[in-house]
Amino acid sequence: MLQTKKYQFWFCTGSQDLYGDECLAKVAEHSHKIVDALNASGVLPYEVVWKPTLITNELIRRTFNEANLDDTCAGVITWMHTFSPAKSWILGLQVYRKPLLHFHTQFNEELPYDTIDMDFMNENQSAHGDREYGHIVTRMRMERKVVVGHWSDPVVQGKIASWMRTAVGVVESSHIRVMRVADNMRNVAVTEGDKVEAQIKFGWEVDAYPVNEIAESVNAVSASDVNALVDEYYEKYNILLEGRDPEEFKKHVAVQAQIELGFERFLEEKNYQAIVTHFGDLGALKQLPGLAIQRLMEKGYGFGAEGDWKVAAMVRLMKIMTAGKKDAKGTSMLEDYTYNLIKGKEGILEAHMLEICPTIADGPISIKCQPLSMGDREDPARLVFTSKEGHGIATSLIDMGNRFRLIINDVNCKKVEKPMPKLPTATNFWTPEPDLYTGAEAWILAGGAHHTAFTYDLTAEQMGDWAAMMGIEAVYIDKDTKIRDLKRDLMLGEVFYR
């Protein structure tokens, strides 16, 4: 399972010295208890670290500077226990460069009706202080997440946990490096994009390598290593010979084992976390990487087909954001292939020639070797399966020429009515929200690609928050989408995102 760095989030409480030492001691005590409770909840994927109460301009600026410089800090959570004059926060906020969450909570859950007095009112002013602080953040046009509710509420804790995963995605984005083993498929538009702008906006480094350079790494893998991995395949997966000679079949599988090991070693040596290939540029490779790529995705690598580096980076990003999640259902590249248009049963059959991540599989996973008309190579081995049912999101990051746009569609995955015995690929089948017809029309109007980065384990809100923190446009297609409203939003986006 993919593991990320043990990130922390700093909990910074605002106040001022106007209230005196006794009050400030209670502020510190309360914020300590909140941090301890959040960490003990079992809901948060990362640790919250208490920081001393911030009461002066210089302390605030120093704390935010330290957060910038601490590689383990993925973001700051702020809360105003008392009133904290917001001009004190300007210098700190100006220098801050990481994700920010404004936690609008208070220590007590219920009004102490019988005992409340002005001392209590002065000490517990979150409703007052958080508005002052919120004003200056808005005036400074800073992107931040606001979570409202009592700190003991599991729903509120879940919102913080959700934001943490997005924040880690923002921080980790600048560490994503994509290896292009092949260029973009000839004459295809949507998989193109400005790689320099992607590095400016997202921090992604996208580099090209000759396919035969990585093929040398593949050829250097020893026979003993290949045989050991093939044995692992045969133990883990069903083997569907379908009339093929067992020894001949195994040789095809061994080619993919050699590719997996060679690719992984090359990626590790060069420090890349995502890869793209193209069936039109295979060089000395004996097969189009299929099973090998599926296994690499399962280990956490991003992948994009036909040179689609944006999808490769997004798949890697989403795997990072979901790393370590309990009961995760999976993340993969997918492609819109063909429709079922029977009334009441509408949906899109999602697949690709070979490369669908087995993390989304439901039930048995099998190895098949079938001819592939594209690539002019040996019959490639691949994993075949059907995917889990349930809700997910399909995302498409596109280059609009003057900016990037992230399209996010809520989809509902289901089983197809009948087996498809002649289809030698892994598949998913979903109906986009609000329905196939509106969803497909909206997707096309927004400019969405035929390749998607798909996951069961993130929400549209999380990916929209990521887009907002990255300063790019997000277009949502969900149960509430109306085409007239979507067209208006797209026109407004043209004006705002210049």
Regions found by a protein language model. Name each.
Residues 52-66, 156-158:
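Structural motif
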Residues 3-26, 175-184:
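Short beta-strand segments enriched in small/hydrophobic residues
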Residues 232, 236-324:
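Long, internal scaffold/assembly segments composed of regular secondary structure
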Residues 376-498:
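Extended hydrophobic packing segments that form well-structured cores
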Residues 60-73, 90-92, 260-269:
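Short, well-structured alpha-helical segments in soluble
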Residues 25-41:
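Short catalytic helix/loop segments, enriched in acidic residues and glycine
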